[in-house]
């Protein structure tokens, strides 16, 4: 039975894990690392790089290296948070055909789902090379506070990557699964998850295989990226004060600042001071300029204090919704790379009145939880019951633009709820059902998930028709809504697709693009491997011809030299053809056989001479036989 993998699709890094017997195994990627940077780059020659190779060339190719794209997934281009991001990233954020925020690289527009799919493909390949078999099914994690549009876009990314996404699971819930799988006694825990781009807090009751989420809260635009950007702004500001040059206008300098900020942030978690040193960051008429600056932990903490404090209100709201006090929380589990920051740990300690639990790896625990959920769905992990909740209230717009809730936030899912509404005007023949998600009282202040019409209502006075609206949320947190006229039995239903979102046709096209890209990547890799093998053979054959060329006939030697020349031409072609290189490699190997034979014979002869010389040097030794009785004396 094919394995189901668990993938933590992170803003900054991604991770893949699988159930190995009763244990979870985090799988190392081709570069030997357990996490993969969530980065995709496009080079000038059309090559696509994912993960560490993309990160390595980011400084020299900033406008075509895409990172933190998860922050844009399922968001409209006009979203204020997108506006903020546009000013701080070196690549271009553009308006997609559907009104969503997309990204641009090498003059081509990509949806965030497409870029996420490329990262998922990399995780899929990582798992396949470890398992030695094809992987087609996965459980993918999302921030608990993701809305329906963001969840749907993540599911679309999985589909584009060629994965059947069996379940979308909330990151803090996954972390709780990994933390509490072997814990029998009942506990109330809080999972504080501050990652690269999002913040979640979930309160759960766990024990004896049951994981019940009591409440969840968070901020989908708060994470390590914001801490980095705050530091980038500070560094650019200091440099401008000192040199009068604004580095934010220089994409290359901006990318170098971003890398330096991330490095400094990490260093300051374990040391009190770090030095940021960026030589030749820019130049003006007077010559090159260098950025050198000492940064203390205290200064960094003062720069980001408001960001850390932004995690407090969601924590308090989650405790209130769960009906527990901070003192009733038995353990606070820290998840996400940013939870390593001492200031964050200090705030958590003050808030919950106890030292947070640091016994899980914050970068890997979410993927491990996803793998456990995959094991549950596959039947490999028994006696585990996971009860998650919907993070935001769901409802429809009613008369006067009021948001009428049908399902309150923190309702256990899957769930289904119906309510009967009527018309607002006489002889109304159709009603528009506008579905929103959020906590504000007016519909326009919440996230519009989608709308549809129920038509063909018989003419009646206002308030007479009985229209039953039903909300159905599945275990992935994805919504389906139906409206039924009780009088006529007419029914209309939709799976909510964000007002932007990707249509099935869009997804199909992207799936085909992804498959074509995977094929092109495979071809490119085969070309590189064939080229490496050919170059190695050329080098060794040329060396052999130089040393032993006189041992073969002139005709054989010329045939070898011609084959080398032909293979060199194939290797040096602008677009190396793997098949052509392999064929010419084979030819060179065949014509070199006589040379190989000659080398072998020459070496045999040398070995024979050496052993003959050795015999001449043998000296006969005198020896005396000792009798047994002498030996024992």
Curated annotation (Swiss-Prot):
SUPFAM superfamilies: Actin-like ATPase domain (SSF53067), Heat shock protein 70kD (HSP70), C-terminal subdomain (SSF100934), Heat shock protein 70kD (HSP70), peptide-binding domain (SSF100920)
Modified residues (Phosphothreonine): 198
Bridged cysteine pairs (disulfide): none
InterPro entries registered for this protein in UniProt: ATPase_NBD, Chaperone_DnaK, Heat_shock_70_CS, HSP70_C_sf, HSP70_peptide-bd_sf, Hsp_70_fam
Keywords: ATP-binding, Chaperone, Nucleotide-binding, Phosphoprotein, Stress response
Region described as Disordered: spans on this chain: 605-633
GO MF annotations, alphabetized: ATP binding; ATP-dependent protein folding chaperone; unfolded protein binding
Gene3D superfamilies: 1.20.1270.10, 3.30.420.40, Actin, Chain A, domain 4, Substrate Binding Domain Of DNAk, Chain A, domain 1
Induction trigger: By heat shock.
Family designation: Belongs to the heat shock protein 70 family.
Name the UniProt record assigns to this protein: Chaperone protein DnaK
HAMAP family (alphabetical): DnaK
Pfam families found in the cross-reference section: HSP70 (PF00012)
Biological role: Acts as a chaperone.
């Amino acid at each position: 039975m094919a394995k189901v993998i668990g993938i933590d699709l992170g803003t900054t890094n991604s991770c893949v894990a699988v159930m190995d017997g009763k244990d979870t195994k985090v799988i190392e990627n081709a570069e030997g690392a357990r996490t993969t940077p969530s980065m995709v780059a496009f080079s000038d020659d059309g090559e696509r790089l994912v993960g560490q190779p993309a990160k390595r060339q980011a400084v020299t190719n900033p406008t075509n290296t895409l990172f933190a794209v998860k922050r844009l997934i399922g968001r409209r281009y006009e979203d204020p948070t997108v506006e903020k991001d546009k000013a701080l990233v070196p690549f271009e954020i553009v308006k997609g055909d559907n009104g969503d925020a997309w990204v641009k690289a090498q003059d081509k527009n990509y949806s965030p789902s497409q870029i996420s799919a490329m990262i998922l493909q990399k995780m899929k390949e990582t798992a396949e090379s470890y398992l030695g078999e094809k992987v087609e099914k996965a459980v993918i994690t999302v921030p608990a506070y993701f809305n329906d549009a963001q969840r749907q876009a993540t599911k679309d990314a999985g589909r584009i990557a060629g994965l059947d996404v069996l379940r979308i699971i909330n990151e803090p819930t996954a972390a709780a699964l990994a933390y509490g799988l072997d814990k029998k006694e009942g506990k109330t825990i809080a999972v504080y998850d501050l990652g690269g781009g999002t913040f979640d807090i979930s309160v759960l009751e766990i024990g004896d295989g049951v994981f019940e989420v009591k409440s969840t809260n968070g901020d989908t635009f708060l994470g390590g990226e914001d801490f980095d950007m705050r530091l980038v702004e500070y560094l650019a500001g200091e440099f401008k004060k000192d040199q009068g040059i604004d580095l934010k206008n220089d994409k290359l300098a901006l990318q170098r600042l971003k890398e330096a900020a991330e490095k400094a942030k990490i260093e300051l978690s374990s040391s009190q001071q770090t030095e940021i040193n960026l030589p030749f960051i820019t130049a003006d008429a007077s010559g090159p300029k260098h950025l050198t600056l000492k940064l203390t932990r205290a200064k960094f903490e003062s720069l980001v204090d408001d960001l850390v404090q932004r995690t407090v209100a969601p924590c308090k709201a989650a405790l209130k919704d769960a009906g527990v006090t901070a003192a009733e929380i038995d353990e606070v589990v820290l998840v996400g790379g940013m939870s390593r920051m001492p200031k964050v740990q200090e705030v958590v300690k003050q808030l919950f009145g106890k030292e947070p639990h640091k016994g899980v790896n914050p970068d890997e625990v979410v993927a491990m939880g996803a793998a456990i959920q995959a094991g549950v769905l596959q039947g490999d992990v028994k006696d585990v019951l996971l009860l998650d909740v919907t993070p935001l209230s769901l409802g429809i717009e009613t008369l006067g633009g009021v948001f009428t809730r049908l399902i309150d936030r923190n309702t256990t899912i899957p769930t289904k709820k119906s309510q009967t509404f009527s018309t607002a005007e006489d002889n109304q023949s159709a009603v528009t059902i506008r579905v929103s998600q959020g906590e504000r009282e007016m519909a326009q202040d919440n996230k519009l998930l989608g709308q549809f019409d129920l038509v063909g209502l018989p003419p009646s006075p206002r308030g007479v028709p009985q229209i039953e609206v039903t909300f159905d949320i599945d275990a992935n947190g994805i919504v389906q809504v139906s409206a039924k006229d009780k009088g006529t039995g007419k029914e209309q239903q939709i799976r909510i697709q964000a007002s932007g979102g990707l249509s099935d046709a869009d997804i199909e096209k992207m799936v085909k693009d992804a498959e074509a890209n995977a094929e092109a990547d495979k071809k490119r890799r085969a070309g590189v491997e064939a080229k490496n093998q050919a170059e190695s053979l050329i080098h060794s054959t040329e060396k052999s011809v130089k040393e032993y060329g006189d041992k073969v006939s002139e005709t054989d030697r010329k045939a070898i030299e011609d084959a080398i020349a032909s293979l060199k031409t194939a290797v040096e072609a602008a677009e190396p053809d793997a098949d052509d290189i392999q064929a010419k490699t084979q030819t060179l190997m065949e014509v070199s056989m006589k040379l190989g034979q000659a080398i072998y014979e020459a070496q045999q002869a040398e070995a024979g001479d050496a052993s003959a010389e050795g015999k001449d040097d043998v000296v006969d030794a005198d020896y005396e036989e000792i009798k047994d009785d002498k030996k024992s004396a």
